[in-house]
Amino acid sequence: MQIKHLITLFFLVLIVADQCSAFFSLIPSLIGGLVSAIKGRKKREISTQIDQYRNLQKREAELEELLDRLPMY
């Protein structure tokens, strides 16, 4: 989810909580969930980028090895 969607969802829950007092107990856990979701997403993005970079390095090394094995004409 994009941050815009998370913020929209957060405000929607706040409006509902204003109308119904039962949702007040959910607000702290909602805020904690949003914060952990944003932090978790950043960690996943960074680890994905690192994995993609490693895969790219492996492919480049394999390609160079393959090109070295080809006969010169």
Curated annotation (Swiss-Prot):
Keywords noted in UniProt: Antibiotic, Antimicrobial, Cleavage on pair of basic residues, Secreted, Signal
Tissue localization of expression: Expressed by the venom gland.
GO BP: defense response to bacterium
Residue numbers covered by the propeptide annotation in the UniProt entry: 45-73
Signal peptide: 1-22
Keyword NAD: no
Protein location: Secreted
UniProt keyword annotation of Glycoprotein present: no
Main subcellular location: secreted
A single cellular component GO annotation: extracellular region
Function of the protein: Antibacterial peptide.
Membership in a protein family: Belongs to the non-disulfide-bridged peptide (NDBP) superfamily. Short antimicrobial peptide (group 4) family.
Miscellaneous comment text of the record: The primary structure of the mature peptide is identical to that of TtAP-3 from Tityus trinitatis (AC P0DRB7) and ToAP4 from Tityus obscurus (AC A0A1E1WVR9).
Protein name, entry field: Antimicrobial peptide 6
